[in-house]
Amino acid sequence: MSQENWIDLEKKYHLQIYGRLPVVLVEGKGMEVYDIDGKKYLDFLAGIGVNNVGHCHPKVVEAIKKQAETLIHTSNIYYTIPQIKLAKKLVELSGLDRAFFCNSGAEANEGAIKFARKYVSKVLGREGGEIISMYNAFHGRTLTTLAATPKPKYQDGFYPLPPGFKYVPFNDIEALKEAITDKTAAIMIEPVQGEGGIHVADKDYLKAVRDLCDDKNIVLIFDEVQCGMGRTGRMFAFEHYGVEPDILTLAKALGGGVPIGAVVLKEEIAKALSYGDHGTTFGGNPLACSAALASVEVIEELIKDDKVIEKGKYFIRKLENLIEKYNFIKEVRGLGLMIGAELEFNGADIVKKMLEKGFLINCTSDTVLRFLPPLIVEKEHIDALINALDEVFTEIKK
């Protein structure tokens, strides 16, 4: 069937909630993906920050094949070796103490909120359970994580949302101080806001937040669903800041393309939880954990010697050079290979034109071109994208 036929079938049978681009992708390898007609694209979105090791990395594929032939699912009534190995790996890498596995970033964030509230209530004896999150944040699409995501375009139509959430501006420590009450249980922050437009936390800000949480006995949650797993050049974005969270959430790139989420937390908080307090049927299944173990090992190699950080700096420099030619580019910002270029207008047409030229990119918050390439990206890939972007911008300028 043709690409158009498949698109027509999707429109007939699938729930129409995605504003998809008009392309049917059928194959991926490394930086490249191919559509049903055989056209090649360079992927600078990586499945929205999922394919950090590239498409179908041989080590991840081999791990999936091997595990699929052995044991796929048992439930968490039983012990499984890949889950135990992955928990150990994430604890060692993060410096935290225990891990819980689920299936997505939204589930991980929902779990983090539950764990924080249980700890503050049961151990600290403080009721209220209020969570403070940031404007421009995105924490998920469940009702609870929507309540932590203060954007009308996501929340509208889904009221009433669960109570107990408060919002403050990102990078504003004074506003955060004013928002804290004796009901505050946790502060939830993305060290680099992704969906909100690639906003990087100030170093002094995260340190001040950590001090504030220590002083007030408040749980600090870092949502690294998008900015974690090597995306910023460190395994976890918080490593750039010398600030450790009480709870860390992960997903997206953790599984190398296979759905898996994780909550990694300190022992003090873990002690507040007992059998039956939380759970999942599929979370931490052998297949997902085997894929994740392979993915983490590959990422460890990719981020060595600041390679990802240097690629990110190169990418940002090349984008900044375009500002001199095109005054409608307001700002370029990012950390590692999590990069945004803010425009003075909606970037949806830019995304479509780049697709025509063979590049997958994204626009978030209406005006921010978002670049999340696999960590295997090379300078020649970046140069090719910049040249294509230059051509598109030139057409617009005319």
Swiss-Prot record:
N(2)-acetyl-L-ornithine binds at residues 141, 280. It is an enzyme of class 2 (transferase). Pathway: Amino-acid biosynthesis; L-arginine biosynthesis; N(2)-acetyl-L-ornithine from L-glutamate: step 4/4. GO terms for molecular function: identical protein binding; N2-acetyl-L-ornithine:2-oxoglutarate 5-aminotransferase activity; pyridoxal phosphate binding. Pyridoxal 5'-phosphate binds at residues 105-106, 138, 223-226, 281. Its cofactor is pyridoxal 5'-phosphate. Its EC number is 2.6.1.11. One of its GO terms (biological process) is L-arginine biosynthetic process. The modification N6-(pyridoxal phosphate)lysine is found at residue 252. InterPro entries: AcOrn/SuccOrn_fam, Aminotrans_3, Aminotrans_3_PPA_site, Class-III_PLP-dep_AT, PyrdxlP-dep_Trfase, PyrdxlP-dep_Trfase_major, PyrdxlP-dep_Trfase_small. Gene3D superfamilies: Aspartate Aminotransferase, domain 1, Type I PLP-dependent aspartate aminotransferase-like (Major domain). GO terms for cellular component: cytoplasm. Binds 1 pyridoxal phosphate per subunit. Its main location: cytoplasm. Keywords: Amino-acid biosynthesis, Aminotransferase, Arginine biosynthesis, Cytoplasm, Pyridoxal phosphate, Transferase. It is found in: Cytoplasm. The keyword Cytoplasm applies. It catalyses: N(2)-acetyl-L-ornithine + 2-oxoglutarate = N-acetyl-L-glutamate 5-semialdehyde + L-glutamate. Belongs to the class-III pyridoxal-phosphate-dependent aminotransferase family. ArgD subfamily. HAMAP family: ArgD_aminotrans_3. Homodimer. May also have succinyldiaminopimelate aminotransferase activity, thus carrying out the corresponding step in lysine biosynthesis. This is Acetylornithine aminotransferase. It comes from Methanocaldococcus jannaschii (strain ATCC 43067 / DSM 2661 / JAL-1 / JCM 10045 / NBRC 100440).
